[in-house]
């Protein structure tokens, strides 16, 4: 697995700014050429520079997999049109929900999705249809309801909050169909998503992620 440490805009919280699947990586406008080249090299995707809600916090607002991409209702029309045109192989939908931090509230790979417990039935149906997943479930991870913020799952493996119980791990592995381990990023942060951006081809971690954390990440994501 390709893996590289990275900082963006002077912070190691790279997952706040970047969304990726196996086809596309969406990044903020204004990154330097070297950073963009590194991202493409590690993740092996087409790079798209964009905004959501006139913000660069793309990793917080966007959730998705290889089948579909979900955007918050705060997405502006021209932003939606731009992403719809450029994410050509993915279904792109706006989720009309009071919840806008979709990256923090939906954990998904191509098989399944674990979602924020307070999504309603209509929202759950739209999420399932857009992502094209076989199974969807509302729940928590280590008592945290923002399930997307405390885990990253690909089609090869997953890493979640260090306090996740053995029982929860088994349930998550059954749901997503991959091995899942516990860990931290950026020198002890339990908010996995903020410091880890991964697809089936490569992994980016925040620059302060330690050697032992990286070994755990590589093992968890199918190294």
UniProtKB/Swiss-Prot annotation:
Pfam families reported for this sequence: eIF-6
| GO terms for MF | ribosome binding; translation initiation factor activity
Transmembrane stretches, start-end: none
**Alphabetized SMART domains for the sequence:** eIF6 (SM00654)
Q: Which UniProt keywords apply?
A: Initiation factor, Protein biosynthesis
Among the GO biological process terms of this entry, one is: cytosolic ribosome assembly
Biological role stated in the UniProt entry? Binds to the 50S ribosomal subunit and prevents its association with the 30S ribosomal subunit to form the 70S initiation complex.
UniProt family annotation: Belongs to the eIF-6 family.
Q: What is this protein called?
A: Translation initiation factor 6
What organism is recorded for this protein?
Saccharolobus islandicus (strain M.14.25 / Kamchatka #1)
Organism ancestry: Archaea, Thermoproteota, Thermoprotei, Sulfolobales, Sulfolobaceae
Gene name as annotated: eif6
């Amino acid at each position: 697995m390709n893996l590289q440490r990275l900082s963006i805009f002077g912070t190691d919280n790279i997952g706040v700014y970047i969304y990726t699947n196996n086809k596309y990586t969406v990044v903020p406008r204004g990154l330097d050429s070297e950073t963009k080249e590194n991202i493409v090299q590690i993740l092996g995707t087409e790079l798209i520079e964009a905004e959501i809600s006139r913000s660069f916090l793309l990793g917080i607002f966007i959730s998705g997999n290889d089948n579909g991409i979900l955007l918050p209702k705060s997405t502006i029309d021209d932003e939606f049109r731009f992403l719809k045109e450029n994410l050509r192989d993915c279904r792109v939908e706006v989720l009309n929900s009071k919840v806008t931090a979709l990256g923090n509230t939906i954990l998904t790979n191509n098989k399944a999705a674990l979602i924020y417990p307070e999504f309603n039935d209509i929202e759950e149906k739209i999420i399932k249809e857009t992502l094209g997943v076989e199974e969807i479930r509302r729940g928590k991870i280590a008592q945290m309801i923002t399930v997307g913020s405390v885990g990253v799952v690909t089609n090869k493996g997953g890493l979640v909050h260090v306090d996740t119980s053995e029982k929860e791990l088994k349930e998550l592995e059954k749901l997503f169909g991959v091995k899942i381990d516990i860990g931290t990023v950026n020198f002890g942060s339990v908010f996995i998503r903020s410091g880890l951006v991964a697809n089936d081809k490569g992994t980016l971690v925040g620059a302060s992620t330690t050697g032992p954390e990286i070994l755990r990440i590589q093992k968890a994501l199918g190294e």
